[in-house]
Amino acid sequence: MSTNNSVLVLKVGGALLQCEMGMARLMDTAAAMLANGQQVLMVHGGGCLVDEQLAANGMETVKLEGLRVTPPEQMPIIAGALAGTSNKILQGAATKAGIVSVGMSLADGNTVSAKIKDERLGLVGEVTPKDGAYLKFILAQGWMPICSSIAMMDDGQMLNVNADQAATALAKLVGGKLVLLSDVSGVLDGKGQLIHSLNGKQIADLVKQGVIEKGMKVKVEAALEVAQWMGQAVQVASWRDASQLIALAKGEAVGTQIQP
């Protein structure tokens, strides 16, 4: 594992795809980092596009404890929305910012091992790091991998993986520093104020109180898992906030620090 955190793993949520200005700003930030020799790996979701595509095909979106339920008949549509449309929208924004990128999925390069997470969720996967050679080769060229959260089991079955968990596995694989970027500035308390730092006990208390729930619960628990595994803080921050992106480019702490 790298000890100098030379790879910055940026996980972006699906809401970014609906904000051209946000995408442009984030890609400009990434371009500046790459120009300074900072290796950047981007992992993305695309929930809003998935919802749109399912609705267009007369299918319903169902979630269980913040995770998307993926029946087999929905898998081709979900894979198309995430590994196809969402990935290429982000790659287009990267190209516009002058970034050389590689669009990929978790299924590429023997990068992760995937299995069914929970039968109740259908074709939802859980991934563990496997082989970092493919990613490390791309990063060594100064290119930016843009990875969707579609994985594949050994039998060729596609799986839909929560993008926060996907980013966690890839951060472990490359020994990188993980930043979970969404449309909120970090974890908020019951009064809507930013919490600058959280540890495992504080997270458990806030989950019990219902302050951290649904998608943010999944996000924070993924961040805590990788923070504990790597022995360093994981950041939960916003792509909407220009000042946070500038600070991020300088290597400063932004948003909420999830402590190991």
From Swiss-Prot:
Keywords: Amino-acid biosynthesis, Arginine biosynthesis, ATP-binding, Cytoplasm, Kinase, Nucleotide-binding, Transferase
GO molecular function: acetylglutamate kinase activity; ATP binding
Entry-linked Pfam families: AA_kinase
Binding site for substrate: 46-47, 68, 160
Catalytic activity of the protein: N-acetyl-L-glutamate + ATP = N-acetyl-L-glutamyl 5-phosphate + ADP
UniProt entry tagged with the keyword ATP-binding: yes
Site features described as Transition state stabilizer, chain residue numbers: 11, 219
GO cellular component: cytoplasm
Secretion signal span: none
Pathway membership, UniProt: Amino-acid biosynthesis; L-arginine biosynthesis; N(2)-acetyl-L-ornithine from L-glutamate: step 2/4
EC numbers: 2.7.2.8
GO biological process terms, semicolon-separated: arginine biosynthetic process via ornithine; L-arginine biosynthetic process
Subcellular location as annotated: Cytoplasm
Listed HAMAP family: ArgB
Role description: Catalyzes the ATP-dependent phosphorylation of N-acetyl-L-glutamate.
NCBIfam families in the cross-refs: argB
UniProt similarity note: Belongs to the acetylglutamate kinase family. ArgB subfamily.
Protein name, per record: Acetylglutamate kinase
Organism of provenance: Shewanella baltica (strain OS155 / ATCC BAA-1091)
Taxon lineage: Bacteria, Pseudomonadati, Pseudomonadota, Gammaproteobacteria, Alteromonadales
Gene: argB
